[in-house]
């Protein structure tokens, strides 16, 4: 009996000691959960876009947000200095779910810790994520070192056995918050494992990452200079679509990007000719965002067909053949737009051939299902893209007037020879926008683009026509455009080209006498560039030639991109065909 009491007493003491030990060792975890439950983490306050604030990324990690946390956009978690600090979920403004994983009562996200302009310390300069083994970027980096007989490629090392320090950017001292090996024990040259498959490279804040974005979908394409993929199409358990993550670096030096391309942002709302001719590529009605489905045209029922991918390759091929100086995307870029569609991923996919070739481009609006709220967000994202000319439109629209200039022989001596107009398909607003610009006598190579056709695209009786003209239904859903059509003539615009009607890829001559208008004008269609089961994907090209003094146009088809069709004169000073 006495012996049993002693055993019970020792058991109680051992249990109390075990409870105390467990409490002490778990206190940091308990403190983290209590603080996330009871204390709201501060919001990330920005004046303008994150790219322009001077904030860099101090650290990156994957953390679990539990159901009892007060907020998952901003959480309390431990820094490398063992302080509870605020971490922010990447791409908080995105409507789609950007979680990496989920379980009972928790969801995991990629979080980042900001390094503010008034703070000292090192920043993350490169990132990689892989759930299975070493990320490909790290493996390639080590392979290149070994290939170049760099001894650093064969081993890992640090300044000491227990610590690795990075020098502070503002002084020559080492930053004491970089005790990587002591905390994690895993590092590879300049790369450090941060758990859950994340690898970080740290360096001076001047080289630090400026922004991290998430993209949802199977066919994400990253083509922007200054941006690099952290992970491509990471499969997520319990989710139908993978996630890709990209980040924006501060400098281009670390990128293997074509040095021949002009990566400088266009600072003036104008276009400068580089040679005697100027080509414009019109892309219309892409309808991107379709699901990946089985290909009914193949015998195997499990064969996969991506609706959008052949059309991206089609645009690539046309650009290789034509080398255009400007790309104009005339509307209806989404297929059945809804809030679950990651429009950023779709836009990057459609402009990837354009951006990768360093071609200036612009969008005209033509999304009937998109509400005003989404329109603002979509246009703001479009305006942020490199080489995009829509940034010069200060309103939430796609109205643009871009002078076409000859190269300056001396500073300030550029001569305007033409004008490119883009309209937003609202007839009244388009009229008011165009009316405020005086006609320049020197500007003769003038073209206009928008998504919807004008009423004058339906002439009566016999008329000149070049191309396919299959859709001839009523345009009563469009307000009367006669005054706008006359104004186009008064401004000496030689042609206007639209999209919208997939069955039409022609140019119709709008006869001034027949339609009781002030002049003749070619009214063109770009055709459908996206996938359409009934119609062949096409693009239209306009060429302004200052040596021949004419404007010509033709089309290329996805069926054979090496051939052109329906070559025609739009205007010629010699032939005076207008």
Swiss-Prot record:
UniProt keyword annotations, A-Z: Signal
Keyword Signal recorded: yes
Classification via CDD domains: MPP_Dcr2
KW Signal (keyword) present: yes
Example of a GO MF term: phosphoprotein phosphatase activity
One GO cellular component, as annotated: cytoplasm
Residues that span the membrane, as ranges: none
Signal peptide start-end: 1-28
UniProt-listed SUPFAM superfamilies: Metallo-dependent phosphatases
InterPro entries the UniProt entry points to: Calcineurin-like_PHP_ApaH, Metallo-depent_PP-like
Annotated function: May be involved in the activation of the plasma membrane proton-ATPase by glucose.
Name the UniProt record assigns to this protein: Protein SIA1
């Amino acid at each position: 009996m006495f012996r049993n009491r002693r055993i019970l007493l020792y058991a109680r003491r051992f249990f109390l000691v075990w409870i105390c030990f467990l409490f002490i060792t778990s206190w940091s975890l308990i403190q983290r959960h209590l603080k996330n439950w009871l204390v709201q983490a501060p919001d990330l306050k920005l004046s303008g876009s994150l790219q322009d604030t001077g904030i860099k990324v101090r650290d990156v990690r994957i953390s679990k947000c539990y159901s009892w946390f007060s907020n998952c956009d901003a959480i309390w978690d431990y820094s490398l200095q063992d302080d509870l600090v605020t971490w922010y979920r990447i791409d908080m403004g995105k409507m789609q779910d950007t979680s990496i994983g989920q379980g009972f009562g928790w969801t995991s996200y990629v979080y980042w810790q900001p390094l503010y302009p008034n703070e000292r310390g090192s920043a993350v300069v490169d990132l990689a994520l892989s759930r299975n083994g070493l990320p490909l970027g790290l493996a390639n980096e080590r392979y290149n070192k070994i290939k170049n007989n760099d001894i650093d490629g064969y081993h890992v090392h640090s300044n000491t056995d227990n610590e690795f320090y990075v020098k502070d950017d503002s002084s020559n001292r080492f930053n004491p918050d970089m005790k990587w090996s002591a905390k994690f024990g895993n590092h590879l040259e300049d790369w450090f494992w941060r758990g859950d498959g994340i690898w970080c490279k740290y360096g001076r804040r001047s080289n630090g990452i400026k922004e991290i974005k998430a993209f949802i979908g199977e066919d994400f394409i990253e083509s922007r200079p200054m941006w690099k993929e952290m992970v491509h199409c990471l499969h997520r358990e319990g989710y139908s679509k993978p996630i890709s993550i990209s980040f924006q670096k501060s400098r281009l030096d670390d990128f293997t990007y074509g040095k021949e391309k002009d990566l400088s942002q266009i600072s003036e709302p104008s276009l400068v000719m580089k040679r005697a001719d100027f080509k414009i590529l019109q892309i219309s009605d892409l309808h991107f965002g379709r699901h990946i489905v089985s290909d009914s045209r193949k015998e195997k029922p499990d064969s996969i067909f991506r609706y959008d991918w052949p059309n991206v390759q089609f645009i690539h091929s046309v650009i290789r053949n034509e080398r255009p100086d400007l790309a104009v995307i005339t509307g209806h870029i989404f297929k059945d737009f809804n809030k679950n569609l990651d429009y950023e991923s779709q836009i990057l996919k459609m402009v990837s051939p354009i951006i990768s070739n360093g071609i200036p481009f612009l969008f005209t609006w033509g999304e009937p299902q998109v509400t005003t709220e989404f329109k603002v967000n979509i246009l703001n994202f479009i305006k942020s893209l490199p080489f995009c000319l829509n940034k010069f439109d200060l309103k939430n629209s796609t109205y643009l007037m871009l002078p076409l200039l000859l190269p300056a022989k001396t500073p300030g001596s550029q001569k305007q020879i033409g004008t490119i107009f883009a309209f937003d398909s609202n007839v009244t607003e388009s009229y008011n926008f165009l009316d405020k610009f005086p006609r320049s006598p020197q500007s003769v190579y003038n073209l206009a683009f928008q998504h919807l056709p004008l009423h004058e695209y339906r002439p009566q009786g016999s008329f000149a026509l070049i191309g396919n003209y299959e859709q001839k239904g009523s345009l009563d859903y469009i307000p009367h455009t006669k005054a706008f059509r006359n104004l186009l003539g008064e401004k000496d615009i030689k042609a206007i080209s639209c999209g919208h009607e997939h069955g039409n890829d022609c140019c119709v001559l709008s006869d001034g006498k027949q339609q009781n208008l002030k002049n003749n004008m070619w009214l063109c269609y770009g055709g459908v560039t996206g996938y359409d089961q009934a119609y062949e994907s096409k693009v239209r090209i306009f060429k302004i030639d200052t040596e021949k003094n004419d404007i010509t146009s033709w089309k290329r088809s996805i069926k054979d991109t090496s051939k052109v069709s329906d070559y025609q004169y739009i205007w010629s000073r010699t032939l005076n065909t207008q």
